[in-house]
């Protein structure tokens, strides 16, 4: 039997930190998840135009078997730059994949982006897209407590005709098993059952997170 975690956030899983950063003028943002050292990861890439970074390194047949962070970002292909600056920030502490002696460790930071270039923000950023700064800013803000909704990677997101955003949830059982999720929702189609006025996911809630919301 599972029940909601203490804060109903992915950071209820021990050792996980999350940070958000936004550029309100441009209408975009970045989110970083920093797990404990030695954490493993896997990826399932879907969609007609996915945008990812270092996902191939997660293949269990490959050499790298741990990650140092995961970055979610707006900005389409430009947003992947947020992971590069996050790698620089995290790498300063010496964290990363050890290749050999006397060579810098290489932070492993898979990333995925969403398309938010059509949300009306000022995308005329010239020679300096904002994602380098957003990656660093999100990294410096990483903590156990973080905001949801119109923040981070979800800042410029849409959910059909509605505003998208950043979501999170956690579950625990009596044996101490903890599961957490972090989502940047930028979906196509309707997220609402207009016959009931509720979100389609309301039937799967645990503590009335969605059933009290009517559109």
Over which residues does each language-model region extend?
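Alpha/propeptide regions of enzymes that mature by internal proteolysis
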Residues: 1-213
């Amino acid at each position: 039997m599972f029940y909601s975690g203490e804060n109903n956030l992915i950071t209820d899983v021990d050792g996980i930190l999350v940070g958000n950063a936004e550029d309100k003028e441009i209408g975009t943002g970045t989110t970083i998840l920093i797990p404990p050292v030695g954490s493993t990861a896997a990826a399932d890439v879907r969609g007609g135009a996915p945008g990812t970074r270092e996902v191939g390194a997660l293949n269990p047949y490959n050499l790298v078997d741990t990650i140092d962070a995961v970055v979610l970002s707006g900005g389409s292909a430009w947003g992947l730059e947020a992971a590069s600056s996050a790698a620089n920030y995290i790498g300063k502490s010496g964290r990363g994949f050890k290749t050999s002696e006397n060579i810098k460790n290489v932070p492993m930071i898979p990333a995925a982006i969403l398309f938010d270039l059509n949300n009306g923000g000022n995308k005329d950023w010239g020679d300096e897209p904002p994602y380098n700064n957003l990656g660093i800013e999100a990294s410096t803000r990483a903590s156990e407590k973080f905001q949801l909704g119109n923040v981070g990677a979800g800042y410029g997101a849409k959910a059909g005709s509605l505003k998208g955003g950043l979501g999170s949830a956690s579950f625990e059982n009596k044996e101490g098993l903890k599961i957490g999720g972090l989502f940047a929702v930028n979906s196509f189609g309707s997220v609402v059952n207009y016959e009931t006025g509720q979100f389609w996911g309301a039937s799967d809630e645990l503590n009335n997170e969605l059933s009290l919301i009517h559109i």
